[in-house]
Amino acid sequence: MNKQLDDYNKILCESGLFFPGPTKGSFIFPPNGLILWQNIQNILNQKFAKYGIKNVSLPTLIPYSFFQKEKQHIQGFSPEFFQVQQIGEKKLTESLVLRPTSEVLFYDWFRQTLRSYQELPFLYNQWCQVFRTEKNTKPFLRNTEFFWQEGHTLHETAKEAQEFTWKMWQEYQNYVENSLCLAIIAGRKSENEKFAGAVESYTVECLLPDGQCLQLATSHYFGDNFCRAMNVEFQSVNKDKDGQPQHPFSTSWGTSTRAIGAIAKTHNDKLGIILPFDVAPVQIAFVLREENEGLINYYQKTKDLLNTFRCQLYNKYKQAKSNIIHADKEGCPLKIIIGKNELEQKIITLARRDDVKRKITISLENSETEKNFLRNFENNLVENLEKYNLENKTKEQLTTEHEKAVDSVEKGFKGDKVIKVIKQEIAEFQKNIYQKSANFRDKHIFLVNNFSELEKKVNEGVKGLFLIPFCNNLDCEKIIPQKIPAYSIRCLSLTEKSEEKEKCIFCSSLADNYAYLGRSY
């Protein structure tokens, strides 16, 4: 195992996101890792809900014959399986496959339930574990067992399905850039790289610091290919001249725990991982310089102001410095450090994970304007409580109500001030870690117009992506591994268009597109 991967594993283990499983390519999700994945689920579920997508759960074990049937109809669809062939001493008449993907299950279900055009669209998503045979495994990047979500939809028309494919692709771009703070390479998959059976596949990828690409999400338009193969039909409102049922048009789209690998590879420093705020298990870490009743009370009051955030007190170790290191290794985006000085001056000290040396001080002392408002509020409150004491409350009861009301208003002042500063720092934090990712990506994309230049850069060990004029011809693409071993077309750019008469650098045919060529996990 090389040093770079050792460092990567160390970051994952020290952050509490990962622990190696007992079998090759498996892993244990410690609390931090699972919470991060659940935060990703929550973000995406909110996006899916906008379209009326509903979550479902399908079986893990799939009859082997389902895949044999699909292989006959879908050229190139032949995933390698984990199979269950025996239960106890009894050999099975038909092997059961541990789910590598769920197309066959969804379409078998659709075949049995869809009847009329009035039931369309079908919009479903599944969060589950899948199993793949991998020779070279890397935590979160290539696993034999991992977590993902896969969405499957059916539509009455091709246009509806194509539009839905595009929408989900855009949602993934938004999620990766804004929630994971990763700069992306997005485009359409080439003929050789698109999903088997798909008419079109769209991808969201990121360029990692080692110069390799990682596919984070895909969205596929299948036309009616899978529905024909699996005999999924519906009765249309407009029957054709023979009155035959119609095949719906389908899509599939998904992302996985690879996202965690991308975060760990991209957002880190010598202290460990740096987690994006949206997905971090703990968004704000509290550290006390010493533990005494005064500081604990001050911490509790400060935490109460921030109940909209995921906060946690880091006090595993006796020394504050060790607790600060612990919070940094776990990648907490923000730290609030409380000591004697903070208590006496009525301030809190804030530190950002991306710039640990910089300290931000927030005062909890009321301004003169706030003090005047509170005095007037208190005077009016006393007068009104006595005037409108319809329930004949005692003096003690009125005093308690009065104190609660004043405390509530004062807490609101303090909360507004603290949250305003924290939101500003969150925005800067997210912007900063995204920009570092974008800067690396932009510096490592190289425009290359001829094969000799490409070959020279590859032989020199230049790491990154090469933007090349490309014909998108399947026969041409299949010879790329012979010319440039370990490289593949990552996607076709939808923003960079090739010049008229520009030629493909591999076969000299006219280029249709610019394509991103690179190595990948």
Model segments located where?
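NTP/phosphate- and nucleic-acid-binding module
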Residues: 1-521
